[in-house]
UniProtKB/Swiss-Prot annotation:
Residues 73-86 have a biased composition (Polar residues). Keywords: Chromatin regulator, Cytoplasm, Cytoskeleton, Nucleus, Ubl conjugation pathway. Residues 1-17 have a biased composition (Basic and acidic residues). One of its GO terms (biological process) is transcription elongation-coupled chromatin remodeling. Residues 29-38, 50-60 have a biased composition (Low complexity). The gene is shf1. This is Small histone ubiquitination factor 1. Residues 1-86 are annotated as: Disordered. Its main location: nucleus. InterPro entries: Tscrpt_reg_Lge1. The keyword Nucleotide-binding does not apply. It comes from Schizosaccharomyces pombe (strain 972 / ATCC 24843).
Length: 165
């Protein structure tokens, strides 16, 4: 509103709006047009009469004031795209690829391979856990037996050395 209001200059003595474009107009017609413009260009109205708008600004007001860009297609491309199948027989429509029957068998084989590999992984983990548990349990027994066998060999050697025939 303020940008359009700057185009009109207010003279306090005449109580009229003076347009800088109408400087060479005779006074009677100027006052009559100004009187009409003052009635239509009130403070409460958001925009002045459309006669003051230039044709370019009134047609482009949507484009300038809107955050979106409006583009009108230059040719009838929208009509051609929607009515192509009915009007033109030479136009090839895009082919729809239906799901292949082998895809389901491939999916099943992949699922079974995944289940088999996960099952074999579980088996390996269980075997490892059993071996670790067994080794932890047996290790102390083996260590004790090693000590006993070393002691037995030593005592046997001592006995052989001490006995005389």
């Amino acid at each position: 509103m303020s940008s359009r209001r700057n185009d009109y200059h207010y003279d306090g003595n005449d109580h009229q709006y003076r347009s800088p474009l109408k400087s060479n107009v005779d006074q009677n017609s100027f006052y009559e047009s100004s009187y009409r413009s003052r009635q239509s260009y009130h403070q409460r109205t958001k925009t002045p009469r459309s006669s003051y708008d230039s044709p370019s600004s009134s047609t482009n007001s949507k484009e300038h004031n809107s955050p979106y860009h409006y583009r009108v297609p230059s040719n009838n491309s929208t009509r051609a795209s929607f009515g192509a199948a009915s009007t033109d027989t030479n136009v090839e429509l895009p082919k729809i690829n239906l799901p292949d029957s082998s895809l389901s068998s491939k999916l099943q084989s992949c699922k079974s391979a995944c289940e088999n590999s996960s099952q074999s992984l579980l088996n390996v983990e269980q075997q490892y856990a059993q071996q670790v548990h067994f080794w932890e349990k047996i290790r102390t027994d083996i260590y004790r037996e090693g000590l006993r066998s070393d002691a037995a060999v030593k005592s046997l050697n001592d006995f052989v050395n001490n006995v005389s025939f």
